[in-house]
Amino acid sequence: MNKSKRLFPKSKRSFRRRLPPIQSGDRIDYRNMSLISRFISEQGKILSRRVNRVTLKQQRLITSAIKQARILSLLPFINNQKQFERSESTPRTTSLRTRKK
């Protein structure tokens, strides 16, 4: 079937191409903490290549830089700083129970 004879013509949606997360001038290095921290989740896990939208080579360099920074203790291995909110404590009710002997 010819394109001009289609019953339901497809509407052309415009899209904006996203900027790459790593610019050409950025060096992927274990000391570049501002760059590395963009590729780590809140728990401290390395985000996947699909989430990061980087090439395979860039992902390998990021992974090795993160691991190197972890070993040199520039980054934590896990980020599990749970912030507990203390609610007001309720007073304990003591019952006057006696044990049977």
Curated annotation (Swiss-Prot):
- Please give the Pfam families that the UniProt record associates with this protein: Ribosomal_S18
* Name of the protein: Small ribosomal subunit protein bS18c
From its record, what is one biological process in GO terms?
translation
Which family is annotated? Belongs to the bacterial ribosomal protein bS18 family.
Which Gene Ontology molecular-function terms are recorded? small ribosomal subunit rRNA binding; structural constituent of ribosome
Ordered alphabetically, the record's keywords are:
Chloroplast, Plastid, Ribonucleoprotein, Ribosomal protein, RNA-binding, rRNA-binding
Quaternary state and interactors:
Part of the 30S ribosomal subunit.
Q: Which gene encodes it?
A: rps18
Q: Which GO terms describe its cellular component?
A: chloroplast; mitochondrial small ribosomal subunit
Q: Where is the protein found, in the record's own terms?
A: Plastid, Chloroplast
Chief site of localization: plastid
Species of provenance: Aethionema grandiflorum (Persian stone-cress)
Q: Spell out the PROSITE patterns in the cross-references.
A: RIBOSOMAL_S18
